[in-house]
Amino acid sequence: MKYFIPLEAGKFYHVFNHAVGSEKLFRNDENYNYFLKKFNEYISPIASTFSYVLIPNHFHFLIEIKDRKELYESYRILELKKEFPKIKPETELDFEKFVMQQFSNFFNCYTKSFNKKHNRKGALFIDYLRRTLISDEEYLRNMVLYIHQNPIHHKMCNRLEDWKYSSYNSMLSQKPTQLEREEVINWFGDLENFIVMHTTKNIEYSSTSEL
């Protein structure tokens, strides 16, 4: 499976990565919360988020890259925040490079904070951001199940609702969220079927991802 394909405007992707060696990405609640805060800061301008899970040594997100018009507006807003902004015309902007730069800035920001907090040096994430294209609605549903079932697969908990750092509980809630909750529920028909499928359908991990 190709894990380093371009992140193109208007397409769905499963994005994921792992800590280097035996390191953990998250050692405490503060790390988890800071990661999500910075994800929202860096990635929400370029993508909509449909589901996620954070495990001590890796993470998974299901996202849709925004369309070119939205990406260009985000680029303009971010560029104008700089001391010396240099705004390219839309026809000259490399959209895929812009998207990847946001992920790179996000990982660098988190790594610097993590290293300072835990008195360590060097890389925290392996390789580059891994991603796979999600091509149809059945694949989208299966990816949501895969992501939410990940903590059970890794024996972090026995019930989906017991793992705090996934989007599963947010999907069941009525509280405001940055997630595309309504669209995700619609993929399953309704909330009842969403819950039933999460508890009755098991996804084959070897055929979906190595994490």
Where on the chain are the PLM-derived regions?
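Short catalytic/metal-binding and nucleic-acid-binding patches
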Residues: 1-211
